[in-house]
Amino acid sequence: MTRSAKKGPFCDAHLLKKVEVATSGKDKKPIKTWSRRSTILPEFIGLTIAVHNGRQHVPVYVTENMVGHKLGEFAITRTFKGHAADKKAKR
């Protein structure tokens, strides 16, 4: 179930403060955050946000197409190593 339209998009307050500082100072350094649940807002366009995936911070450059999505969608948490080889096929 999606979030109610009357509530509006959710974004953590500490992340909004960091974005305001970055846009006012024209700072190109990535904004480090653990908030994967925050929605990408139009103010984030053009910024690089380092989103934590449980192990490291993955840099995500925000474009216009990403607005409305969550930050966690762009930082993959699971690594796929491939399926085990079939032992019968090797013989």
UniProtKB/Swiss-Prot annotation:
Gene3D superfamilies from the UniProt entry: 30s Ribosomal Protein S19, Chain A
Gene designation per UniProt: rpsS
Pfam family for this entry, one: Ribosomal_S19
Family: Belongs to the universal ribosomal protein uS19 family.
The name this protein goes by in its record: Small ribosomal subunit protein uS19
Purpose of the protein: Protein S19 forms a complex with S13 that binds strongly to the 16S ribosomal RNA.
InterPro entries cross-referenced by the UniProt entry: Ribosomal_uS19 (IPR002222), Ribosomal_uS19_bac-type (IPR005732), Ribosomal_uS19_CS (IPR020934), Ribosomal_uS19_SF (IPR023575)
SUPFAM superfamilies assigned: Ribosomal protein S19 (SSF54570)
Any GO CC annotation of this UniProt entry: small ribosomal subunit
Alphabetical UniProt keywords: Ribonucleoprotein, Ribosomal protein, RNA-binding, rRNA-binding
An example Gene Ontology molecular-function term: structural constituent of ribosome
Entry keyword rRNA-binding: yes
One Gene Ontology biological process: translation
